[in-house]
Design a protein with these regions (language model features):
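Conserved alpha-helical scaffold segments that buttress catalytic/binding sites
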Residues: 1-130, 157-158
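Short active-site-adjacent structural elements
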Residues: 102-107, 135, 145-149
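Short, electropositive alpha-helical surface patch
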Residues: 113-114, 146-162
Length: 162
């Protein structure tokens, strides 16, 4: 994020983090930084445990209950995050996507599918097109089920290159 503002000249950067684990490190770094918007979804019962409220106005946490379906999470993201993202009007969007939310991943308890990852990717790509001339960085975080991870990465990257 700092490189985007310092090197690329971006005034505002949005970080969208979809993962089974809370982006507490990112939140600790960027809380209170008006040049960064952090939108974070995570499994409420995954480490680090707890559903503490966001620590600053530029942070939106979306804890997800165990068993939350991808389509349910995506509906919430569209309703709660998109207005915030469009109001923020970033110069760059960073999508940090963890495939440990997949329903076949036995280490976590969320129920996303590869179709959900493709939908999320399209949603963020559309926002990047509308807001920041398609400036989008994708960071893939991983997952624990190798077969589900492979299909999920393929769905995500395949959508990015369409």
């Amino acid at each position: 994020m700092r490189a985007a503002t310092q090197v690329l000249g971006c005034r505002r950067v949005a970080l969208i983090d979809v993962d089974a684990h809370r982006a507490d490190g990112s939140e600790n770094i960027f809380a209170g930084d008006a040049s960064v918007l952090l939108l974070d979804s995570f499994q409420a019962t995954a480490f680090p445990y707890g559903v503490a409220p966001a620590t600053a106005a530029n942070v939106t946490n979306m804890p997800l209950d165990d068993g939350t379906l991808g389509r349910e999470a995506l509906a919430r993201m569209e309703a709660e995050w998109l207005p915030r993202l469009y109001d923020f009007a970033p110069d760059l969007i960073v999508l940090s996507i963890g495939f440990d939310t997949h329903y076949e991943d036995t280490q976590t308890l969320l129920k996303f599918s590869e179709f959900d990852y493709a939908y999320l990717t399209r949603l963020v790509m559309r926002a990047a097109h509308d807001l920041c001339s398609d400036r989008l960085v994708s960071i893939m975080e991983g997952g624990y089920n190798k077969k589900a991870l492979a299909r999920s990465v393929l769905a995500h990257v395949g959508t990015l290159v369409q």
